[in-house]
Amino acid sequence: MNLVGHARRRESAITAPDRISLHRVSPHRVSPHRPKTVVVGAGVIGLGIAWRLAKAGCAVTVYDRGAAGHGASWAAAGMLAAAVETEPGEETLLGLTLESQRLWPDFAREVEAASGIGVGYRDEGTIVVALTRDDAEQLRFTYEFQKGLGLAIEWVSGAEARRREPHLRPGVSAAVLSPYDHQVENRALARALAMAAQRAGATIHEHCPVRELEIGGGQVRGVVTAQGRDPADVVVLAAGAWSREIAGIPAPYLPPVRPIKGQMLALRMDPAAPLLRHVVWLPRGYLVPRRDGRLVVGGTVEERGFDDTVTAGGLLALIEGAWRAVPAIEELPVAETWVGFRPGSRDDAPMLGPSGIDGLVVATGHHRNGILLTPVTAQAISSYVLSGRVPDSLRPFSPDRFGSPRPAEAVFSPAAQ
């Protein structure tokens, strides 16, 4: 359940999360035939798009209301769980998540090479555990549904689950193994994408929110920030849960995105003797082990707007759910707690592609799949900006699918720039 949006953290002295450093880079050649592009939002989605476009020769400027990568891209758990997160009604989304999952190994290597920063890609896989008979019945139902979609998952006994993860509670009754649902260190990914984008020639402005989108004659003209006006041929709206907060966009064209609050915490394991190797999905929540010894515990799902309060009840639910599966966590120190906001759409699928306003491109609403969908979103949105053709993979996720009065195809054509 990845949180793409805003994060507010409470940290103990035991953890001091790395900050993303923005560096001046040598000038890169910008093609006069490429559209000048502004990306609104410096989360992993916006940074991935900016990197791809800058590599292709576009002049790219990224604006963010906070620090680059420090919204809920920072708050996410980094799970790449295309299989085990698929629920009934999400069959269309599955095609996109599987495609992005397939891209991830090469994408991780490419980002690392471009940035010089490791992204912590791990391929041990995911285990979903059932702790009671009722849990096992629900897990069997979900397993049969996912298996019926052709997903590469395996039903295993509780004993086999404990063989793979000895610190699981002895009473684990059954489990599902998903070997291709991997993980990435999302905070490192955000740092790496910011660096890669800058090295490719993009400019990133932190703590500089876009106040207004300038539109004239049905066409994007640029954006207005605290620093002034920035003309642009294309504006990519990738502001997560804040994608409706920008003035100047006519109401029918605002993406129907809302914040979905998630509370999370991290425990501190001994890196030399971690309690877990796999990502472990619980009946209520999940555990994600990091190589640095952090054990990420998540996450609540709350319709509370932009309330960024960490609550006793939220933490209790997370810790109790984790303890029921892995009792050994009770001696671990709490390293950090935080809140993030997933950008949810009406159908919990992303909104990707032309908005109906010439030059305004939407890339938001990724809900719990923002980290997973970063490679395919960056690839498809940059392809559209450069070619003017909507990739087939994006058509089911058009921003106009909710019935807003906008054309199915945008009139934007890079060839006309």
Task: Please provide the spans of the model-predicted regions.
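Extreme N-terminal leader/targeting segments of oxidoreductases
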Residues: M1-T37, K55
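N-terminal Rossmann-like FAD-binding beta1-loop-alpha1 element of flavoenzymes
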Residues: K36-T61
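Active-site substrate-recognition segment that forms the wall
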Residues: W51-A56, Y63-R65, G78-M79, V84, ...
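Helix-loop-beta segment of a Rossmann-like dinucleotide-binding subdomain
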Residues: I117-A130, T142, L149, E154-A200, ...
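Helical element adjacent to the flavin cofactor pocket in flavoenzyme catalytic cores
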Residues: V176-A226, D230
